[in-house]
């Protein structure tokens, strides 16, 4: 497992320009993914990946669970995290790569973020109930044990229980931004998220910039501002 300094050296030497396949943005069932951390290792091996980063929302809890499996499979596991942040009222995601999953400050802050998510989830569920949908926090948590529940988990719950015809419909009709059951939540400032990732020894990367719906000028300003705050990279390929 490498640290941030090693990552920098490898980057300068063109280490990531070879033919090895990697994936630096992967979620597990510790947040809104569909595979457990251990299952992700198996999937990565089958896909022929040389390395992958486990970057669950607001948690590094899956990293220790995947480490032994990754070692046995001969795959490099990059410890990571994805933080939902606020940039002048716009939600922007920052991925941290090579973070220390045991860093005390990171653990403390992510616990705060998770509590905010829990409060928000309860309000979303209440709003969905007000629309006549059959969902409870108890049922949602029972189907998503020991993980950070996101809107994607809620959307999948609605779909799997026949409340909507697709996950997309759940977002489009109910819980997407500006929809009737959407509930905002506290988000750490983008600049503070970058500082937190650095404090945990990590590399801060702007995630999927194409998804923010910004024009060229606004996107350039976002990148310029975050670079001034210490941003290390930009996600160029996202799927």
Q: What are these language model-derived features?
A:
Residues 8-90, 174-177, 188-239:
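An N-terminally biased module of ancient metal coordination in phosphate/nucleic-acid-related enzymes
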Residues 71-220:
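Extended substrate/RNA-proximal surfaces in nucleic-acid metabolism proteins
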């Amino acid at each position: 497992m490498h640290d941030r300094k090693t990552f920098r050296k490898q980057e300068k030497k063109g280490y990531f320009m070879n033919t090895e396949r990697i994936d630096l943005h992967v979620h597990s069932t510790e947040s809104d993914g569909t595979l457990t951390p251990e299952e992700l290792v198996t999937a990565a091996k089958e896909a022929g990946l040389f390395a992958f980063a486990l970057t669950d929302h607001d948690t590094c809890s899956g990293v220790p669970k995947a480490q032994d499996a990754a070692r046995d499979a001969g795959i490099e596991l990059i410890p990571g995290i994805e933080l939902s942040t606020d940039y002048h009222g716009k939600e922007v995601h920052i991925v941290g790569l090579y973070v220390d999953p045991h860093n005390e400050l990171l653990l403390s802050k992510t616990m705060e973020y998770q509590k905010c998510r829990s409060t928000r989830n309860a309000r979303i569920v209440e709003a969905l109930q007000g629309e006549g949908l059959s969902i409870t926090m108890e049922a949602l948590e029972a189907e998503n044990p020991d993980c950070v529940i996101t809107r994607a988990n809620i959307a999948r719950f609605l779909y799997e229980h026949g409340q909507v015809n697709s996950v997309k419909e759940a977002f489009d009709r109910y819980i997407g931004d500006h929809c009737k059951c959407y509930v905002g939540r506290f988000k750490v400032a983008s600049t503070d998220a970058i500082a937190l990732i650095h404090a945990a020894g990590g590399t801060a990367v702007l995630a999927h910039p194409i998804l923010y719906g910004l024009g060229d000028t606004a996107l350039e300003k976002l990148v310029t501002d975050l670079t001034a705050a210490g941003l290390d990279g930009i996600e160029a390929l996202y799927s």
